């Protein structure tokens, strides 16, 4: 979990970590992603996952409307997909910043 946590924190200096629902959540202009252990590995869930491009085909929908996740069964699998995960994390951060700026712009026009 620490390898994936470090990848998330490497996205930028303004990433904040908070424990919610007994799991680590990461925030950047709102909720960005979270890490969740499973009995056979762990997964990273992206809060705005339904808006991500998923060009690598790694994001899974399962039975969720908005959240998309990537399940890892081993550290080797995580290391093998490191570059793709970093790209998804960066895209998620850019998306959150975009939505934050749009919301801020709407408030200024009122």
Show the residue positions of the predicted features.
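Charge-dense, helix-prone N-terminal extensions
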Residues: 1-110
